[in-house]
Amino acid sequence: MNMDILEQQLQELPLYGYFFIDPKDLEFNSRIRWICENECPMCGKTWACPPGVGSVNSCKAKCLGYSNCLMIATITEVEDISNIDETLATRPEHEAISDQVGQLLREQGIEPYILSTEACAICDRCAILDGQPCRHPDRMHPCV
């Protein structure tokens, strides 16, 4: 991977910021899962969300299989950050940028494991609700 080229490409995207980190330095715990399970209306309704996405430990194992992690941040204004529905509505713009970053990594020969902070919205009705496998596993970003 050519880091200079990648960083130049990242600087051309509408990112608030980005940084690289060793996956061993990431913190994996169940606090975020608690929010999913107790506050998010999408929990259990998409393959990107618990329990479909797997356990925190399975996510940790997959992340630790990488030698480097790229964290990106975008900013979208909302009136009330505590309004989960309003916050979830900002998903499409961020996911589109995540997809662009994923493509840049693929062009460098890296198959990324893209995690998101929100549920998947690719399909109108997720296959998990019908007991079927994900129809778009190559496009779905699992929720952290």
What are the language-model segments listed below?
Residues 16-46, 50-144:
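Catalytic cores of enzyme domains
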